[in-house]
Amino acid sequence: MKKFFCLSIFICGLLLSSCSSSSIAGSILSAKEGSETADGRMIDTEASKITGNSDSTATSTPTPEPTLTMTAAPTLTQTPTPTPSLTPSPTSTPTAPDLVSFSYSDLHQGVQPVAYIEDPCDYLISRWDEDKSAPGTIVVPIMFHSVAKPGREITDSTTISVAYLDYFMERAKTLGFSTITTEELIGFLESNEKIPERSMILILDDRRPGVIEEYFMPYLEENDWTLTLAWPTTDATSNSLWERMESLAETGYLDVQSHGHDHIYIQDYTPLEEIEEEVYQPVEVIQSHFGTTPRALIWPGGNFNQISVQLAQEAGFKLGFTVFSRGPVMYNWIPLGPQETAMGAPLLVLPRFWSTAADAALEKALQIGEEARVAAEILKAEELAYIASYCQPQDGD
């Protein structure tokens, strides 16, 4: 009985061993044939490629079974999720809105106001500085030539009568205008330096000492006004004329500026050396005879081109005047036609009214100045808010 029991145990052990081997072999075979991915594709383990789930059975060349090295699965430690906290983001500078520019509908066709202050903060801070010129302040540049004596017939478009000059001067006073110098105009146009709200710059072209002495000087002395001279410095000037002009300049009523050297009308075909002489030579001559450096170039005949404007900048001129009656000028507001605008230097191609319509120029300027003042008041709150938002100094400035 004992022998029979031992034999039974031995037979059962053999059967169990056979089942276990078959099961392991089946598992290995199944792994070799492939496994199915989550998207229904079959992975061919031996061929190391992905094939589509197909009803056909691929025939492959048996390869030696790889030796599988069992490694322990890594233990995954869950990292706790940190509690989100609010961290300040770097302060970014918001985009500043576009500023509204003053426009005037009654300018001549093709004439547009040009702004020239690049930094809007510089412009607005100067515009609303109480120690500077108020919005609506205007400057009227006026060009004079000959003044005809009583009884003389006027046959050209640049000469005015004594009677008209007298009328204009009285009208200017009645309207509250006064004169400014070139330096004052530069300060106003560049940084809105304070000048009279109704200003004019009277410019007498060419070499006319008699006109100065007989017709202008009485008004200059009476009103403490200044006359700007557009003076050609030609080599043909006599010593006696120089002495006469130097004596007049000593009165303090004259503001001598350049009108070229030989009064050449600059054209695109004008030789470069002639343009250079027109621009550079007067600087030295005026310094020699009047002890001042000219800061304005009144273009001879009103002619200029890109080369002459560039040379004027290099020579140190801050202003230039044409013969175009475009309108009065204001801070950061210069009315220009296409020819002047193309130069890219608004302050070197400023407009001038002709003396034959000088009184009308003053009336028009007052209208423009008043509209500009009203427009500025409407925009004041918005522009002050702009300054507060975008023009404050940053840390480290």
Residue map of PLM features:
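Ser/Thr-rich, Proline-interspersed low-complexity disordered segments
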Residues: 22-127
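A structural motif
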Residues: 245-262, 275-279, 286
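Acidic (Asp/Glu)-rich catalytic clusters
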Residues: 216-224, 237-257, 313, 340-343
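C-terminal motif of bacterial Sec signal peptides marking the signal peptidase cleavage site
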Residues: 16-18
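N-terminal pro-sequences and low-complexity stem/linker regions of secreted or lumenal proteins
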Residues: 162-163, 228-235
